[in-house]
Amino acid sequence: ANCLVGSEMCIRDSSIIVAGMGGSAIGGDIVSVLEKECIDIPFFVCRGYSVPNWVNKNTLVICSSYSGNTEETLAALDDSIIKGAQVCGVTTGGSLAKKLKIENKDVVIIPSGLQPRAALAYSFVPMIKLLQKIGILDTKIDSWLPDVIESLLNDRELHSQDSKENPIFGLADKIYNRIPIIYSDNSTVNVAALRLKGQICENSKMLCYHNDLPELNHNEIVGW
């Protein structure tokens, strides 16, 4: 990916927001997991047309839109600029890249030609690099990436096999003609559960629902 650097970002922000929708927001969700261990300032993912009223000049808003034409993200960008936030973007181009260039702001241009949900790494890794650049994340995270890539490659090989040993076949058989409900705790695996729910809905064209613990213990559990 290419980083077109405009005006200098501040070295330290008081809060960070990722504005995005669907597959373009999941990268921010993954980064938010790091907040518990590696990020010592507030980090939020906003899915919608605006950002919170407390956003100001000390807030960094990262606008993530694979196509660059997501209307909610473009509106959130405009709202962020009005509120004086520092803004940047991760996109393949479109109106988002054009607006950021006009504003002389940073934009990471990532490869096009994919479905947004298949471009997770292209939205996630640039955010990591950006936060390292401005001193929010330690560079030690770079040492994790090769292990993650190797693990994903090994899993892909296993899950691509046409055999009974492939655990994905068993899972697919269990949820066929059903409505899956995915429960997770609200720590690190919550993002994985949300991602799985989205993948089932978009790739399999079927309904799927997700909730997390311990919140569901106070309401949804009664429905069972």
Segment roles from a protein language model:
Residues N2, G22-S24, D40-F43, Q86-V87, ...:
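A short linear-motif detector with a strong N-terminal bias
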Residues A1-G6, C10-I11:
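Single conserved hydrophobic/aromatic residue that forms the stacking wall/gate
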Residues R12-N154, D173:
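Glycine-rich phosphate-binding loops that contact phosphosugars or nucleotide phosphates
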Residues N2, Y49, N53, S112, ...:
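Flexible, active-site-adjacent loop/turn segments at secondary-structure boundaries
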Residues S7, Q132-W224:
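Active-site phosphate/pyrophosphate-binding segments
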